[in-house]
Every structure is written in C-alpha cells, then in structure tokens.
C-alpha cells in the first residue's frame, strides 16, 4: 500500500482500503487506522467490522468514525481530534477518496494552525479544501481555547438561494451575478 498521502509526521490519508492491505499498512509503520466511511456507502466497500478484524489481526488499532460526505459536524471534528490524541504512532485515516479524512484533519488542526498552511498542505497531497476555507478561518480566529459545539454543523451558506432551476431561475441568477459577481448563489 503506497497510495497514501502524508499530511503530518503522524498522519497520512488514503482512499478506500481493503482488508488484505492492512498487514502491509502495519509493515509500513502505521499503528492506527481510522475509517471515516459510513458502512454501506458504496458497493465496493468492505464493512467496518471486516476491516476491524483484519486490522486487529495485523496488530493495528482500529477506529470507525463515520462521516457523511459534506456534513462534517463539530462532533466529528472533536471525535477525530480525540482519536489523534489517543493514538500511538503514525495514523492512517481513510474514506472513499481521502478528502473527508483530510478535511477532518484540517478542521481539527485549524484552531492552532493557519488555514493557508492547512490548505496548502492538503493541496500538495492532492486534496482541495477550498470549500472548507471559511470554516477553517472561523476556527482559526476563535483560537485554541475555543471548543467546537457538539451537534453543531457549520453548513455551507449562500448569499442567495434560487428556488426553481428552470429558465427563470437561471436568468435571475445570471442577472444577480452580473450586478454583483462576488455573490454566492445556490
């Protein structure tokens, strides 16, 4: 298994892994695996229970912290940060593509690390965290003492919501953008 991307000395992320890869993951020096995929998310996906059995047989600690794509809550961030703190040795976190795991890492580090650094690090690894930038900035401004609120989810916000995607809705969105190009419209 060599298709993981290192984000820090103690964390690498990857796309979906298979049970047969876990012995190789252990040989590469990882001590902990964090699975960020909900079970039954895809047809090609082994169950968390199957992965846990293979991880333990390979001598790895295994944690399942399922996160729905696009819905990372403050509780998820706290959970990921807690797992990183309690894990011994290098950690491999994975999801379908590695993007959720890299987002969880950046959000859990954002109170202590400048968002531009986090985004650049993820970008070098091939992950685009630009959609998380506002949330990263918010957590950075709040600082290390600020705690996420369990149950809170910083959903994406928009300046304008156009209801109806037909010709009228598209014309309204185009007209608004022509007048104010900086608007975010959904």
What are these regions (language model features)?
Residues 1-91, 103-147:
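Cys-dependent protein tyrosine phosphatase-like superfamily
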Residues 95:
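Short cysteine clusters
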Residues 101-102, 169:
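Catalytic nucleophile loop
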Residues 143-158:
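A short, basic/flexible loop-to-alpha-helix module at the beginning of a structural domain
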Residues 157-186:
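N-terminal Rossmann-like FAD-binding beta1-loop-alpha1 element of flavoenzymes
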